Amino acid sequence: MGDTDVTSDANAPWLIVGLGNPGPEYARNRHNVGFMVADLLAERIGGKFKRAGKAQAQVIEGRIGPPGPANRRVILAKPMSYMNLSGGPVNALREFYKVPVANIVAVHDELDIDYGVLRLKLGGGDNGHNGLKSMTKAMGPDYHRVRFGIGRPPGRMQVADFVLKDFASAERKELDYLVDRAADAAECLVIEGLERAQGTYNS
């Protein structure tokens, strides 16, 4: 698993990882909401994703927060390895940019939370999420998560079918607002800390 320093350092960069699957056929799937949030954060920073060498990920480097001590250096990342292999690219980026595990934020879909509800936390289990499972295997569980609720599949629909389908038409009416809110939550976590972000965004 390698050296996985979990101690947050005020001067260390932050790595915000949007989890998803690469390719246009997955772009609007429920499972790709992490990519949607990462894309919005990229727009805010004002950069374009570029290939990260051998890390099998797309990245943008930038800064967020007001001038002064609260200004943070961030790396936005979208693993290009498919969801269940996300840990390898994320850990490679962590090592390359010297990011403490505690300075990593994974933005991902969450089945056990109602649609659009956010829950922020540090550490914990993977709750059956293959992207988190891969990350935890690569570097341990002590990273932050922005969990974006997608709810459970209706009736007898299989979970795999549900997460790999696009959001329903009724859900899409709110999706832009909810993705914007999740991006705000990730920024707040990095700039002001987990407790403040939880108090503001945990629904």
Swiss-Prot record:
UniProt site positions, description: Stabilizes the basic form of H active site to accept a proton: 109
Please classify the protein's predominant subcellular localization into one broad category. Answer: cytoplasm
Q: Which organism is it from?
A: Streptomyces avermitilis (strain ATCC 31267 / DSM 46492 / JCM 5070 / NBRC 14893 / NCIMB 12804 / NRRL 8165 / MA-4680)
Where is tRNA bound in this sequence? 26, 82, 84, 130
Q: How does it assemble?
A: Monomer.
Please name the PROSITE patterns in this protein's record: PEPT_TRNA_HYDROL_1, PEPT_TRNA_HYDROL_2
**Family the UniProt entry places it in:** Belongs to the PTH family.
Lineage of source species: Bacteria, Bacillati, Actinomycetota, Actinomycetes, Kitasatosporales
Keywords, alphabetical: Cytoplasm, Hydrolase, RNA-binding, tRNA-binding
Gene name? pth
Q: What does this protein do?
A: Hydrolyzes ribosome-free peptidyl-tRNAs (with 1 or more amino acids incorporated), which drop off the ribosome during protein synthesis, or as a result of ribosome stalling.
* Location(s), subcellular: Cytoplasm
Enzymatic class: hydrolase
KW Hydrolase (keyword) present: yes
The protein here is known as Peptidyl-tRNA hydrolase
Q: Which reaction does it catalyse?
A: an N-acyl-L-alpha-aminoacyl-tRNA + H2O = an N-acyl-L-amino acid + a tRNA + H(+)
Record's GO cellular component terms: cytoplasm
Return the PANTHER family for the record: PEPTIDYL-TRNA HYDROLASE
